Curated annotation (Swiss-Prot):
Pfam families: Oxidored_q2 (PF00420). NDH-1 shuttles electrons from NADH, via FMN and iron-sulfur (Fe-S) centers, to quinones in the respiratory chain. The immediate electron acceptor for the enzyme in this species is believed to be ubiquinone. Couples the redox reaction to proton translocation (for every two electrons transferred, four hydrogen ions are translocated across the cytoplasmic membrane), and thus conserves the redox energy in a proton gradient. It is found in: Cell inner membrane. Keywords: Cell inner membrane, Cell membrane, Membrane, NAD, Quinone, Translocase, Transmembrane, Transmembrane helix, Transport, Ubiquinone. It catalyses: a quinone + NADH + 5 H(+)(in) = a quinol + NAD(+) + 4 H(+)(out). It is a multi-pass membrane protein. This is NADH-quinone oxidoreductase subunit K. The gene is nuoK. GO terms for cellular component: NADH dehydrogenase complex; plasma membrane. It is an enzyme of class 7 (translocase). GO terms for molecular function: NADH:ubiquinone reductase (non-electrogenic) activity; quinone binding. Belongs to the complex I subunit 4L family.
Amino acid sequence: MPVEYYLWLASILFGIGLLGVLTKRNALILMMSVELMLNAANLTFLAFARRSGDVAGHAIAFFVIAVAAAEAAVGLAVVIAIYRSRGAINVDEVRVLSE
């Protein structure tokens, strides 16, 4: 399978994630959109690693996955804490820093 197919898929996934970040106001949807964008970047790293035959792309993708898992855990904990204290997870309704 040509590498260009992987790059097209990665760009489509990144576009869907970017669309979710720009249009949605739900904190969970925003987190999922960011994760989708990170996975698109991982797919790009892996596609170029496959083309060059180097394992550096695989190592970078592995570390991005680890950072994304930590980001998701911390972000979900923050969203749950905000929901428990405010009763909403809409980013327009919740202004934590202003109060």
